């Protein structure tokens, strides 16, 4: 196509309006037209990455194939577009400042006074252009975290102003705002949108397209009013009404010609509207599913759904491909005990023992693992969930009553989960775990091999602790098989009990690899087993 086109997505009025979903939807529509598209997220916080953030603070920490701990929006980008993102797709203010300060310490600025403008803004601009320059994408969509008016966002908005001036028709700004409905007056109010756009204009950025989040349809007069007072064309005012699923949003945007408006404004041919056949097939299959499969998620962050966002989406996708709707029941591992486990888990079709860190709520995960093993309920343990399945097995089948992970009990005599050798000398917490995609070889006579239908796989990891190979023989002899092994480190990646319907734990995070059009085979297999329970 020639020069890379840059689309900036900003937000106003309120946070959590769905900039990530709009960015993903734009990306999906452009991708469907044959363009090579990627999406990046700029987060205005000063952490280097979200790896050390509490899930209650920031939701799930997503992991890219190259081992970067990233914002959960990258999960949306990958699920919608079926692409793989990298460290370059998620930048924080902390990383920007660290890069500039490191350059200053090296003497790269030749003794100049380092300032927000031009040094910080130049570093932001360099990172915006990096993906286009290095990988020759046709479109780079850049989502700016936060809300217009936040102090933290100012350097990013100044960078957008400069880039729009420098790139001309090759840069475009989509601004997402909220149109509230006042029930007392039975009226939609556009004033917050007008003020948000005015705030953006005061910073030198004129939005080219407005996407209005709303719970009610916006009539033509209201759209004309917004267009007039915000200096945008009428066809550039698009509504984003509440949908039953986020996966409907690309179709809703396509119906209003959002992708066509973008192409026109960037001087590109519009051509035929792509049919999005497989995407529509997925949505039709989802809508036509009448039966429900009930899955319990046992974890310590269950009050906040975003803490397990990728798992929820993976279960939802897998259920669709099994022609089912999925009902999720959240079970707090902190409050799960032998006395109430039957009430909590006895009626469900399957159980996911969620990942996590630390000892809080760990005993409840052991209770869940024991109950589902003894009652032959399909069970999927992920990362710490897999470790809990192994510890429970050691305690109640092998007879090691004090079996534990070194993470939870440094004095345990039976450390069936041990710290990885290369982690022993590490003291810093941020970005130091075993992160990213690693190879795994599957045993052919296993349920996981049946699911994957291939022997060599690659999956993403985020952990410091591993299954202790000193116990492997005892586990195997007692019935828990180690069926997935890393060929380089001999690390146990997957355990399963083949005599049970579906009792599998993975040290890796399969949820990071599941997409709308290619659901993860383990989740599909798990849901199928849960249906057959």
UniProtKB/Swiss-Prot annotation:
EC number(s) per UniProt? 6.3.4.2
Q: Which SUPFAM superfamilies match?
A: Class I glutamine amidotransferase-like, P-loop containing nucleoside triphosphate hydrolases
Give me the reactions it catalyses: UTP + L-glutamine + ATP + H2O = CTP + L-glutamate + ADP + phosphate + 2 H(+); L-glutamine + H2O = L-glutamate + NH4(+); UTP + NH4(+) + ATP = CTP + ADP + phosphate + 2 H(+)
Molecular function (GO) terms listed?
Answer: ATP binding; CTP synthase activity; glutaminase activity; identical protein binding; metal ion binding
User: GO biological process: what's one of them?
Assistant: pyrimidine nucleobase biosynthetic process
Q: Which residues bind CTP?
A: 15, 150-152, 189-194, 225
- Residues that coordinate or bind Mg(2+): 73, 143
Q: Alphabetically list the UniProt keywords.
A: ATP-binding, Glutamine amidotransferase, Ligase, Magnesium, Metal-binding, Nucleotide-binding, Pyrimidine biosynthesis
Q: Which residues take part in binding L-glutamine? A: 56, 356, 384-387, 407, 464
Question: To which protein family does this belong?
Answer: Belongs to the CTP synthase family.
- Give the protein's function: Catalyzes the ATP-dependent amination of UTP to CTP with either L-glutamine or ammonia as the source of nitrogen. Regulates intracellular CTP levels through interactions with the four ribonucleotide triphosphates.
Quaternary state and interactors: Homotetramer.
Record's protein name? CTP synthase
The record lists the organism as Bacteroides fragilis (strain ATCC 25285 / DSM 2151 / CCUG 4856 / JCM 11019 / LMG 10263 / NCTC 9343 / Onslow / VPI 2553 / EN-2)
């Amino acid at each position: 196509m020639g020069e890379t086109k840059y689309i900036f997505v900003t937000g106003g009025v309120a946070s959590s309006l769905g900039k990530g979903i709009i960015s993903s939807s734009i990306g999906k529509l452009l991708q469907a037209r044959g363009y090579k598209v990627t999406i990046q997220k700029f987060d205005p916080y000063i952490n280097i990455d979200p790896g050390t953030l509490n899930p209650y603070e920031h939701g799930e920490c997503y992991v890219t194939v190259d081992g970067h701990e990233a914002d959960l929006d990258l999960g949306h980008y990958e699920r919608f577009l079926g692409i793989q993102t990298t460290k370059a797709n998620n930048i924080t203010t902390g990383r920007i400042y660290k890069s500039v300060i490191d350059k200053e310490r090296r003497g790269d600025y030749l003794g100049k006074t380092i300032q927000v403008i031009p040094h910080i803004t130049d570093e932001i601009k360099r990172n915006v252009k990096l993906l286009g320059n290095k990988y020759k994408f046709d479109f780079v969509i850049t989502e700016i975290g936060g809300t217009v008016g936040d102090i933290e966002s100012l350097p990013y908005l100044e960078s957008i102003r400069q880039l729009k001036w420098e790139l001309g028709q090759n840069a475009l700004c989509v601004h997402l705002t909220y149109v509230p409905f006042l029930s007392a007056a039975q009226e939609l109010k556009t004033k917050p949108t007008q003020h948000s756009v005015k705030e953006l204009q005061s910073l030198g950025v004129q939005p080219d397209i407005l996407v209005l989040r709303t719970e009610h349809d916006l009539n033509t007069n209201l759209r004309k009013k917004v267009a007039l007072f915000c200096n945008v064309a009428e066809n550039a005012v698009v509504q984003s009404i509440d949908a039953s699923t986020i996966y409907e949003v690309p179709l809703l945007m396509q119906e209003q010609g959002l992708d066509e408006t973008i192409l026109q404004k960037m001087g590109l041919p519009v051509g035929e509207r792509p049919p999005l056949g497989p995407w529509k097939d997925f949505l039709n299959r989802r809508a036509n599913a009448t039966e429900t499969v009930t899955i319990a998620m046992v974890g310590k962050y269950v009050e906040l759904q975003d803490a397990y966002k990728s798992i929820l989406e993976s279960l939802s996708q897998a259920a669709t491909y099994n022609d089912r709707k999925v009902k999720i029941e959240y079970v707090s591992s902190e409050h799960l005990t032998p006395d109430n486990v039957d009430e909590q888990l006895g009626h469900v079709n399957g159980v996911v023992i969620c990942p996590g860190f630390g000892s809080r709520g760990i005993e409840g995960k052991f209770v869940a693992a024991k109950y589902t093993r003894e009652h032959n309920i399909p069970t999927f343990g992920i990362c710490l969930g897999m470790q809990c399945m192994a510890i429970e097995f050691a305690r109640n089948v092998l007879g090691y009553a004090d079996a534990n992970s070194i993470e939870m009990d440094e004095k345990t005599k039976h450390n069936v989960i041990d710290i990885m050798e290369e982690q022993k000398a590490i003291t810093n917490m941020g970005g130091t775990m075993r992160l990213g995609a690693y190879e795994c070889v599957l045993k052919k006579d296993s349920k996981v091999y049946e699911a994957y239908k291939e022997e060599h796989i690659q999956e993403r990891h985020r952990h410091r602790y591993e299954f202790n190979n000193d116990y492997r023989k005892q586990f195997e002899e007692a019935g828990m098989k180690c069926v997935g092994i890393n060929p380089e480190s001999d690390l146990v990646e997957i355990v399963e009990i083949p005599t049970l319907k579906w009792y599998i734990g993975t040290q890796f995070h399969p949820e990071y690899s599941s997409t709308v059009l290619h659901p993860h085979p383990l989740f599909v297999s798990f849901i199928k087993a849960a249906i057959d329970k």
